[in-house]
């Protein structure tokens, strides 16, 4: 067991009373997580730690959001950006629930197919972009309609508005 001095030394950001901690985000992706959750800082206290040491990942990012709970849709977005993420639900400064995000089997209406000829990109069609999730560690999505693949870079770019 660690001494309290070691624990205090390792505590980079103060504890939050109520909210969530998104831990084990791959290094460099915390800002993307904030963007897809549409958090700008005015919602309450948001703490961000980037490139922290991690036994599991080598380096990781951490996001703490006070007064926030994630919907299932938001959890799915986080899982696309950070499939290794762990969610900690905090109440009265204690972790009451902890779980790893899980990629859904299909992703519907979140990202667009990058194939311009796909039926989902045709203005006269009412097809909603739907993808099968193929790889769980580094998500690769396959369009249900045309078979085009989206990589993690494609997903990140679309979710952050960079494409």
Swiss-Prot record:
Binding locations of Zn(2+): 113, 118, 143, 146
Highest taxon of source: Archaea
Cofactor detail note: Binds 1 zinc ion per subunit.
One GO MF term attached to the UniProt entry: metal ion binding
InterPro entries to which the protein is assigned, alphabetical: Asp_carbamoyltransf_reg_N, Asp_carbamoylTrfase_reg, Asp_carbamoyltrfase_reg_C, Asp_carbatrfase_reg_C_sf, Asp_carbatrfase_reg_N_sf
Keywords: Metal-binding, Pyrimidine biosynthesis, Zinc
A Pfam short name: PyrI
Gene Ontology process terms (BP): 'de novo' pyrimidine nucleobase biosynthetic process; pyrimidine nucleotide biosynthetic process
Cellular component aspect of the GO annotation: aspartate carbamoyltransferase complex
Subunit and partners: Contains catalytic and regulatory chains.
Function: Involved in allosteric regulation of aspartate carbamoyltransferase.
Protein name from the UniProt record: Aspartate carbamoyltransferase regulatory chain
Species per Swiss-Prot/TrEMBL record: Caldivirga maquilingensis (strain ATCC 700844 / DSM 13496 / JCM 10307 / IC-167)
Underlying gene: pyrI
